[in-house]
């Protein structure tokens, strides 16, 4: 069985037969429109976010499977806040403010893909992403929020 794997980032629910998908899948002998339709069906809940997708093509049988990953933490942070982009200058501008409940929600979504051992550390990873997006947590800078977590200020969220 000759399998080819194509990994791409697509906008949720808006994959097209054009680049980057079409040129990568076209030569493998499967119906591109069927692949696009399946990707769009599987990613429609992530509308407007970049979603990692893996298309596994069996070139002998001309069949395919689609695996959808979880969007990057930065995309989940922006969606949770309802903003299109982060701050232009993250150290000098604030694009929004997450609550600890929102941080924990994102951490639970991403936990399987993270290296963190527990929810507390996964939440700290999400807060680390907030640095580059220009988002504060509970009115604190991300670094202050991480220190507050270390000090036990938000332990009630991790039990």
UniProtKB/Swiss-Prot annotation:
Record bears the keyword Aminoacyl-tRNA synthetase: no
InterPro entries: Ribosomal_uL11 (IPR000911), Ribosomal_uL11_C (IPR020783), Ribosomal_uL11_C_sf (IPR036769), Ribosomal_uL11_CS (IPR020785), Ribosomal_uL11_N (IPR020784), Ribosomal_uL11_N_sf (IPR036796)
GO biological process: translation
GO molecular function: large ribosomal subunit rRNA binding; structural constituent of ribosome
Protein origin, superkingdom: Archaea
GO (cellular component) term, any one: large ribosomal subunit
Keyword field: Ribonucleoprotein, Ribosomal protein, RNA-binding, rRNA-binding
Function: Forms part of the ribosomal stalk which helps the ribosome interact with GTP-bound translation factors.
Quaternary data: Part of the ribosomal stalk of the 50S ribosomal subunit. Interacts with L10 and the large rRNA to form the base of the stalk. L10 forms an elongated spine to which L12 dimers bind in a sequential fashion forming a multimeric L10(L12)X complex.
Protein family per UniProt: Belongs to the universal ribosomal protein uL11 family.
Descriptive protein name: Large ribosomal subunit protein uL11
Lineage: Archaea, Methanobacteriati, Methanobacteriota, Methanomada group, Methanococci
């Amino acid at each position: 069985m000759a399998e080819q794997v194509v990994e791409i980032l697509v906008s949720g629910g808006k994959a097209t037969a054009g680049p980057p998908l079409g040129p990568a899948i076209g030569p493998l002998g499967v119906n591109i429109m069927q692949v696009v339709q399946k990707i769009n069906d599987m990613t429609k809940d992530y509308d407007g976010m970049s979603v990692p997708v893996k298309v596994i093509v069996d070139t002998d049988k001309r069949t395919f499977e689609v695996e959808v990953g979880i969007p990057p933490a930065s995309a989940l942070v922006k969606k949770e806040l309802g903003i299109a982009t982060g701050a232009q200058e993250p150290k000098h501008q604030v694009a929004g403010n997450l609550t600890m409940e929102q941080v924990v929600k994102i951490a639970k979504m991403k936990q399987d893909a993270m290296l963190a051992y527990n929810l507390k550390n996964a939440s700290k990873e999400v807060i680390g992403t907030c640095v580059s997006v220009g988002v504060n947590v509970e009115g604190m800078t991300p670094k202050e929020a991480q220190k507050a977590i270390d000090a036990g200020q938000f332990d009630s969220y991790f039990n």
